[in-house]
Swiss-Prot record:
Its EC number is 2.7.7.27. InterPro entries: ADP-Glc_PPase, ADP_Glu_pyroP_CS, GlgC_bac, GlmU/GlgC-like_hexapep, NTP_transferase_dom, Nucleotide-diphossugar_trans, Trimer_LpxA-like_sf. Homotetramer. Coiled coil: none annotated. GO terms for molecular function: ATP binding; glucose-1-phosphate adenylyltransferase activity. It comes from Lactiplantibacillus plantarum (strain ATCC BAA-793 / NCIMB 8826 / WCFS1). Pathway: Glycan biosynthesis; glycogen biosynthesis. It comes from the Bacteria. Involved in the biosynthesis of ADP-glucose, a building block required for the elongation reactions to produce glycogen. Catalyzes the reaction between ATP and alpha-D-glucose 1-phosphate (G1P) to produce pyrophosphate and ADP-Glc. This is Glucose-1-phosphate adenylyltransferase. The gene is glgC.
Length: 379
């Protein structure tokens, strides 16, 4: 049944709220949890759900993301029965170039989707941390005879201001949609996960864009139009672990949760693996001066200091006398001697000089950017 469904991952966003961490790379390529990048979770969900063909729509700073995805072999997408295709903006005969929003990105890739000839289109965001069976959502979509099914989670009133919110009837049919309301009428928030009947969506996009060049987003344009036209739109409630890591604080929190043995993400589940691009690296090395407490230290790390409740990604070096607490250090970062890092996110390949102090709080996480150098005298 899954072969009738094509997966499209929207991975072109700039991620401006992550500041320096996405200055030179796309948000889905940001490292997470020591061994992964954010997009690994969505790609792995597709692989585990039996979604064999996936298109990844990229745009902003795509080079690192494209290299990470490669042929898709790390997720099993290099077989004869499927594959992964990176879809980038291009100039058409109509002069179209960059994607203006989620719906516009799908419209611009109609030709690719038509080549796959799916009955259902699964549209996903490439910047969330979660594990989800999309096949179960497809079965729900079919049982409801829906035209569109939206994945939803329950959120607080305060959180609702950041999401598209939905009101439903007793059968979970969506009767009203509000984009980031000040006073939400329900607690059901869109996860940015959609299953469309492709012929219906295709017809809508072609007709709408022919008359309205401002067509941009699913939340702003498509869902309200579906509801206005009395299409059958249903909410699919997801009850597992799901995190939107679009802000510095939420990215830090999700990494700290990752350290907990009671984390609902259950990364050790052998029946639902999270895959990533494999690198052949030497083992980590802990010197006699090192101390590691409730931390994750992965391949090719060198540690001569103290690591407490933190994540050290691949190829991180921590000098003697340094202390890293409640922090996530991204791949390739170099930390000198007698450094204090507390409540911080340290970007990929950053360099922290001797005696530096990078100290944040739970409410204001300290950040060192991608390839940024701090506390080192420049020649």
């Amino acid at each position: 049944m899954q072969d009738e469904m094509l997966g499209i991952i929207l991975a072109g966003g700039q991620g401006t709220r992550l500041g320096k961490l996405t200055k030179d790379t796309a948000k889905p390529a940001v490292p997470f949890g020591g061994r992964y990048r954010i997009i690994d979770f969505t790609l792995s969900n597709c692989a585990n759900s039996g979604v064999n063909t996936v298109g990844v729509i990229t745009q902003y700073q795509p080079l690192e993301l494209n290299a990470h995805i490669g042929s898709g072999a790390s997720w099993g997408f290099d077989s004869l029965n499927g594959g992964v295709t990176v879809l980038q903006p291009y100039s058409s005969s109509e002069g179209e170039k960059f994607f203006q929003g989620t719906a516009h990105a799908i419209y611009q890739n109609i030709e690719y989707i038509d080549q796959q000839d799916p009955k259902y289109l699964l549209v996903l965001s490439g910047d969330h941390i979660y594990k989800m069976d999309y096949d179960a959502m497809l079965k729900y979509h079919q049982e409801k005879k829906a035209s569109l099914t939206v994945g939803v989670i329950h959120v607080t009133n305060e959180e609702a201001k950041r999401f598209g919110m939905m009101n439903t009837d007793a059968t979970d049919r969506i009767i009203e949609f509000e984009e980031k309301p000040e006073h939400p009428k329900s607690d059901k928030a869109s996860m940015g996960i959609y299953i469309f009947n492709w012929p219906t969506l295709r017809d809508y996009l072609v007709k709408s864009y022919a008359t309205d060049k401002s067509l941009e987003d699913f939340g702003k344009n498509v869902i309200p139009s579906y509801l206005a036209n009395n299409e059958s739109v249903y909410a699919y409630a997801f009850k597992g672990y799901w995190r939107d890591v679009g802000t510095i604080k939420s990215l830090w929190q999700a990494n700290m949760e990752f350290l907990s043995p009671h984390n609902r993400l259950n990364i050790g589940d052998r029946y639902w693996r999270i895959y990533s691009k494999a690198e052949v690296l030497p083992p980590m090395f802990l010197t006699e001066t090192s101390q590691v407490n409730n931390a994750m230290v992965v391949d090719s790390c060198y540690v001569a200091g103290e690591i407490d409740h933190s994540i050290l990604s691949q190829r991180v070096s921590v000098g003697m006398g340094s202390r890293v607490v409640d922090s996530m250090i991204m791949p390739g970062a170099t930390i000198g001697k007698n450094v204090v890092i507390d409540h911080a996110l340290i970007g990929e390949d950053a360099v922290i000089g001797d005696d530096a102090q990078i100290i944040g709080t739970t409410d204001k996480i300290a950040v060192v950017g991608y390839h940024e150098t701090m506390g080192v005298e420049q020649p």
